[in-house]
Structure formats: C-alpha cells, structure tokens
C-alpha cells in the first residue's frame, strides 16, 4: 500500500468535497443507502478479472461490443460500476447473471478507485491520475484500458496527457495508433499496448442498415455539408 499517496489523497478529498453538483441528504436518502450497499458488495467480491466504469447510462454503447463478446465467448463475470442510478446496465443485469452492476456516486468513486483490486479496469474517461480519479493505491499491476468515444483524431480532441496513465488503448484505426506512438516518442513516455479493434458503434449501424428495406429513388438528391 502506498501510504504517502493515501495521505495525499486525504488532502485532495477535502479539496474536492463539493464535487458532484447537487447535494443529497446523507441520512434516509434511498440513493445513499443503495450506494453504500453497492460499495460494500463490490469489495466483498474477490478475484475480480474485469471491471468497467461508466459515468452515465449513455456511455454503455462504447463498451457494448466488448461486453457482448466477453459474455458470448468467455465465462468472465462483468463487474460494471456506474455513477448513474438509472443506468440501463441494471436492467440488462436482470437477464444475465454474469453482469454485476454497482451504483457508485462521484464522491465515493474516488475512494473506490484508490482501493481498486482487479486484473483489468476498462474506462472511457480520460485524464486518469491527472485529477481526482487515481490508479489503485492497493494494487500496482492492474491493467487500465482506455476506450475512445469516437473515430476522430485523439490529438485534436483530447487534452495533452489525458491518456498518459493508461496501460492500453483500444484504437479505432491506424490513425489513432500512429498519433499515440508519435506522442510517446515526442514526450518520452512509456509505450502502451495499442489494439486496433475498430469501432463497434459503426459495426452496429452497418448491421442495422443492412436490415432496413432499401428503395432507390428515381429523383436524385444532392447533400451539401
């Protein structure tokens, strides 16, 4: 355990005590009770292989392709942390007992991440370690994987250093891989594992389009963009 880092984290927690927007009542609030139960339940599980973290329900779509593949091709249990109490993952979990969802608000998430114990943590949130969300102080061999939101340039859309503390990045294509490699050379950063895995959202759009009925129009249309 990195005790110096833990001591520093106490100061950081005090400095960001108002994080998370509107304040909730701590006593008698059903979300507070639910959060405490899920926090305790998460740490009661040993040997967690894969943990996903989602900021809200809308981010599930970036993980969907990976999660569905793991469920279909492995026996891995998916531990899914979300800061959205209405996240669709809770409904999905009712039909698949290998999905274990947990509601953890933004404040309690800080300490949960500091105490994280898992083989792999998958996130779509940049700036790991740069701000309030840290790598685990308990376990140093966790592999942190970053999943991009889109297919565009990471250099043009991300802050400098926003991926420096991830171990792996699932790149949507060759252009993202080359950008990261050149950034690592320019700033003398440790090399990450860069996986060219594509973009599952585009795959799903193509499948949906193939299912649609198509009829060619005799009148040509011009799209100006």
Describe the predicted segments one by one:
Residues 1-5, 12, 70, 174, ...:
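Generic low-polarity alpha-helical segments
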Residues 1-51, 68, 72:
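Non-catalytic N-terminal targeting/anchoring module and adjacent flexible stem/linker
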Residues 3-6, 86-87, 96, 202, ...:
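Short, structured coil/loop segments at alpha-helix boundaries
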Residues 11, 18, 185, 210-214:
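Generic surface-pattern signal
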Residues 38-48, 207-225:
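Nucleotide-sugar donor-binding and catalytic loop/hinge architecture
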Residues 51-206:
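Active-site and donor-binding regions of nucleotide-sugar-utilizing enzymes
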């Amino acid at each position: 355990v990195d005790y110096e880092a833990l001591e520093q984290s106490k100061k950081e927690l005090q400095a960001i005590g108002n994080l998370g927007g509107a304040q909730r009542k701590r006593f008698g609030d059903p979300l507070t009770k639910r959060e405490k139960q899920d926090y305790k339940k998460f740490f009661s599980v040993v040997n967690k292989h894969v943990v996903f973290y989602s900021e809200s329900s809308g981010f599930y779509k970036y993980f969907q392709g990976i999660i569905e593949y793991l469920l279909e091709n492995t026996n891995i249990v998916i531990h899914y942390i979300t800061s959205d109490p209405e996240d669709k993952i809770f409904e999905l979990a009712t039909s698949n007992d290998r999905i274990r969802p947990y509601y953890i608000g933004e404040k309690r998430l800080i300490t949960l991440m500091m105490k994280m114990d898992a083989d792999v943590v998958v996130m779509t949130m940049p700036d790991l370690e740069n701000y309030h969300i840290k790598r685990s102080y308990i376990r140093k061999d966790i592999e942190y994987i970053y999943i991009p939101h889109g297919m565009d340039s990471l250099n043009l859309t991300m802050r400098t250093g926003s991926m420096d503390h991830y171990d792996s990045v699932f790149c949507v294509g060759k252009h993202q891989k080359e950008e990261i490699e050149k950034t690592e050379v320019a700033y003398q950063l440790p090399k990450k594992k860069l996986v060219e895995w594509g973009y599952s959202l585009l795959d799903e759009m193509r499948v949906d389009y193939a299912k649609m009925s198509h009829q060619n129009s005799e009148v040509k249309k011009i799209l100006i963009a």
